[in-house]
């Protein structure tokens, strides 16, 4: 199979169907020290829900964890094969003991220190909805500048994403897609894990695959407790269009049209492994809020400004920071 030009640059954002907005704030902001950089609404379905964005100071690509708190919709998703199963953050070398103690103080059940691909890490789950997280020790060179959080000292703060892990039953077809269509390069194996990287790797440049032949497929619908999609960065709309054209030419035709998401432009493709990938062009978060005010107000489409208060009452999902 023909290998395409290297158009995908790295991890952009991860989007997760969670439980409650306050549960997300309690974990992402008050425990992990991220900034709530944007509060918007998601309008699909019978009732609106929040779409929340967490990251570093300006929500740079490679730091963005976005959530749909969907508990009120009453549908719980099933985690399983064909999904992102863990989101891993970078932490400075020597800080895992601090993070372990901090998580325990915050009533988060956390693992002992483990090692994979020669790197030490902790694993834990979102206390409110069960989605998987890891904190991995890595040199801070070339990593993202952390948000100056009142909850986490800057010297131990998380510095954007290290990697994401996809759980699959098999990897043959997904391996071909990632190498030939998504320009990921195999980096080696550790047990049932296969590592891939963009370019030479580094912060927000790594994707791991965990093979579990017995794991049942997870659900694709937007249900509480599962990662909905994994978004990857591309430089601009022309690169995005060329990527779609060429990947479809390889036979991977399950692509969406371009979607304007307010803060990025997106196309989606269902991969052979079942994981929903997105190619995302960054537009930024400061066109409707100043940098110092990011995340302070709920933002809605202009045509909905007149009914914003009514929508918020309908959601009935208050946030206290």
UniProtKB/Swiss-Prot annotation:
**Which residue intervals define the domain VOC in the entry?**
10-138, 160-282
Query: Keyword Metal-binding: yes or no?
Result: yes
**Entry keywords, A to Z:** Aromatic hydrocarbons catabolism, Detoxification, Dioxygenase, Iron, Metal-binding, Oxidoreductase, Plasmid, Repeat
Q: List the disulfide bonds.
A: none
**InterPro entries from the entry?**
Extradiol_RC_dioxygenase, Glyas_Bleomycin-R_OHBP_Dase, VOC
The protein's enzyme class: oxidoreductase
What does it do? Cleaves aromatic rings with two hydroxyl groups at para positions with consumption of O(2). Catalyzes the cleavage of chlorohydroquinone (CHQ), as part of the gamma-hexachlorocyclohexane (gamma-HCH or lindane) degradation pathway, producing 5-chlorocarbonyl-4-hydroxy-penta-2,4-dienoate as an intermediate product that can react with water yielding maleylacetate. This degradation pathway allows S.japonicum UT26 to grow on gamma-HCH as the sole source of carbon and energy. Can also use hydroquinone (HQ) as substrate, leading to gamma-hydroxymuconic semialdehyde.
Similarity remark = Belongs to the extradiol ring-cleavage dioxygenase family.
This chain belongs to the protein called Chlorohydroquinone/hydroquinone 1,2-dioxygenase
- Organism of origin is Sphingobium indicum (strain DSM 16413 / CCM 7287 / MTCC 6362 / UT26 / NBRC 101211 / UT26S)
């Amino acid at each position: 199979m023909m290998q395409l030009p290297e158009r995908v640059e790295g991890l952009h954002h991860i989007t997760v169907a969670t439980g409650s907005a306050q549960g997300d704030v309690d974990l992402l902001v008050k425990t992990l020290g991220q900034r709530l950089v944007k509060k918007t609404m998601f309008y699909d379905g019978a009732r609106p829900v929040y779409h929340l964005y967490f990251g570093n100071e300006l929500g740079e690509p490679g730091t963005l964890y976005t959530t749909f708190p969907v508990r009120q919709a009453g549908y719980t998703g099933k985690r399983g094969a064909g999904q992102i199963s863990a989101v891993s953050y970078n932490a400075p070398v020597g800080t895992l003991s601090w993070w372990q103690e901090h998580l325990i103080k915050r009533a988060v059940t956390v693992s002992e220190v483990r090692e994979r691909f020669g790197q030490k890490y902790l694993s834990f789950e979102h206390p409110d909805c069960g989605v998987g997280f890891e904190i991995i020790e890595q040199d801070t060179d070339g990593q993202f500048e952390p948000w100056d959080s009142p909850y986490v000292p800057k010297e131990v703060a998380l510095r954007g994403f290290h990697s994401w892990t996809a759980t699959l039953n098999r990897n043959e077809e997904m391996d071909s897609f990632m190498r030939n269509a998504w320009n990921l390069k195999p980096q080696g194996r550790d047990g049932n894990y296969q590592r891939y990287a963009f370019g030479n790797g580094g912060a927000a440049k790594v994707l791991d695959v965990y093979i579990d032949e017995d794991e049942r497929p997870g659900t694709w619908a937007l249900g509480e407790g599962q990662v909905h999609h994994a978004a990857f960065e591309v430089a601009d709309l022309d690169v995005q269009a060329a990527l779609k054209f060429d990947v479809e030419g390889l036979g991977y035709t399950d692509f969406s049209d371009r979607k304007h998401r307010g803060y990025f432009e997106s196309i989606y493709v269902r991969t052979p492994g079942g994981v929903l990938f997105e190619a995302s062009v960054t537009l930024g978060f400061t066109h409707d809020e100043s940098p110092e005010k990011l995340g302070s107000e709920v933002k809605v489409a202009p045509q909905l400004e007149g009914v914003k208060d009514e929508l918020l009452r309908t959601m009935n999902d208050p946030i206290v920071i």
